[in-house]
């Protein structure tokens, strides 16, 4: 039998990866964030006309991207609507892996009784998925996220309600965002004990300037077989080389600011100059190489920024680069991790201090991130 070779990828975005051990769908290594797709939030995020949005989506698709993230509240609903219109216009729904979210109320400010349009309960879920499928012009979403944990819904109600959608074919995989690790592990344990689909993805804020996920979330994802979708990887657009003037184009609300953007930019810029790459490439490569199954969510409105981010997929940081970046601010891993280990993220028994005093041991190496691809785009993946 003669096997036809696949079409060569146009960029590293077209070398797709398995999403997670618990989710075997294949996705592009970068996910296009839909928060900036729409014009309803122009005052806070800048202008994005439908023509601009479609150009960005076309560029993402043409370069091999197939993973798009949105939510029921983004841009007052325009994000889902425009993404759905773009997929329908080009007949690309089957090629794309689309995630959306529920929990935050899309009716804020409307003169109606809003009690059940938000939250993690069954009615909020029912209303949200109905409207999301209509807006996206599809009969299913690949991933449905719990957008944030509201501490109001019991785990059994949540997991059974989500799995009703799984059984109906309206949702393929489940994700959770902005929630404590203990909630996720408790929910996944309940799901497995009751023959239900567990969470396969976690979305949270993570970057060189905000490494909180290293305490509990990243180890949890690896133990649970989950992918990590970090947002804010590029400092919410505020990682900038000191050599370049601030245009003021990015208008980020104060709650999204960390306060370390300027100092971390200097550290990242020093590494970027050694590699002769943009500062954003270093910020992106750092997150991609920290753990396996990491798929950053990248926003923005300009195709040229997207193309620059794709180039980061070929950048391999050295151990010295990573150490330099992590000295950019004093990250405290906290108790009990600092008590058990050596001050960094614990990946296994090799990182536990009391064991190192008991002898010399060999352990199976922890799972690592995929190394940046080098050489021809069609060349086989190199050794880890």
Swiss-Prot record:
Domain of life: Eukaryota
Disulfide bonds: none
Keywords recorded for this protein, A-Z: NADP, Oxidoreductase
Catalytic residues identified in the record: 74 (proton donor)
InterPro entries to which the protein is assigned, alphabetical: AKR_Detox_Biosynth, NADP_OxRdtase_dom, NADP_OxRdtase_dom_sf
UniProt cross-references to Gene3D superfamilies, sorted A to Z: NADP-dependent oxidoreductase domain
Pathway the protein contributes to: Secondary metabolite biosynthesis
Binding site for NADP(+): 69, 177-178, 203, 301-309
Enzyme class: oxidoreductase
Molecular-function annotations in GO: oxidoreductase activity
Coiled coil: none
Family named by the database record: Belongs to the aldo/keto reductase family. Aldo/keto reductase 2 subfamily.
Function of the protein: Aryl-alcohol dehydrogenase; part of the gene cluster that mediates the biosynthesis of dibenzodioxocinones such as pestalotiollide B, a novel class of inhibitors against cholesterol ester transfer protein (CEPT). The biosynthesis initiates from condensation of acetate and malonate units catalyzed by the non-reducing PKS pks8/GME11356. Pks8/GME11356 lacks a thioesterase (TE) domain, which is important to the cyclizing of the third ring of atrochrysone carboxylic acid, and the esterase GME11355 might play the role of TE and catalyzes the cyclization reaction of the C ring.
Protein name, per record: Aryl-alcohol dehydrogenase GME11368
Organism per entry: Pestalotiopsis microspora
């Amino acid at each position: 039998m003669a096997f036809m070779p696949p079409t060569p990828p146009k960029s590293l975005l077209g070398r797709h990866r398995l999403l997670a051990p618990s989710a075997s769908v294949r996705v592009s290594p970068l996910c296009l964030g839909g928060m900036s797709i729409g014009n309803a939030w122009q005052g806070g995020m800048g202008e994005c006309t439908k023509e601009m949005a479609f150009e960005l989506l076309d560029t993402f698709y043409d370069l091999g991207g197939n993973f798009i993230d949105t939510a029921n509240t983004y841009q007052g609903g325009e994000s889902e609507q425009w993404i759905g219109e773009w997929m329908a216009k080009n007949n690309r729904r089957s090629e794309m892996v689309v995630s959306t979210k529920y929990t935050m109320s899309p009716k804020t400010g409307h003169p109606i009784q809003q009690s059940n349009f938000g939250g993690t309960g069954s009615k909020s879920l029912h209303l949200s998925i109905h409207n999301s499928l209509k807006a996206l012009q599809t009969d299913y979403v690949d991933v449905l996220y719990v957008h944030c944990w509201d501490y109001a819904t019991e785990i059994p109600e949540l997991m059974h309600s989500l799995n009703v959608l799984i059984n109906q074919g309206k949702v393929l995989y489940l994700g959770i965002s902005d929630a404590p690790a203990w909630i996720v592990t408790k929910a996944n344990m309940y799901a497995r004990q009751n023959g239900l689909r567990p969470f396969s993805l976690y979305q949270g804020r993570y970057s060189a300037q905000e490494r909180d996920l290293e305490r509990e979330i990243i180890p949890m994802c690896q133990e649970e077989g989950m992918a990590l979708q970090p947002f804010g990887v590029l400092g919410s657009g505020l990682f900038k080389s000191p050599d370049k003037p601030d245009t003021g184009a990015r208008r980020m609300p104060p709650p999204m600011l960390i306060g370390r953007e300027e100092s971390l930019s200097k550290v990242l810029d020093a590494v970027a100059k050694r590699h002769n790459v943009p500062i954003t490439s270093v910020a992106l490569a750092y997150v991609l190489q920290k753990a396996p199954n990491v798929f950053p969510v990248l926003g923005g409105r300009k195709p040229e920024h997207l193309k620059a981010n794709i180039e980061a997929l070929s950048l391999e940081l050295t151990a010295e680069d990573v150490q330099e970046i992590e000295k950019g601010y004093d990250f405290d891993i906290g108790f009990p991790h600092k008590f058990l280990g050596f001050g960094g993220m614990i990946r296994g028994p090799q990182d536990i201090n009391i064991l190192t005093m008991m002898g010399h041991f060999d352990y199976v190496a922890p799972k690592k991130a995929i190394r940046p691809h080098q050489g021809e785009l069609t060349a086989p993946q190199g050794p880890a």
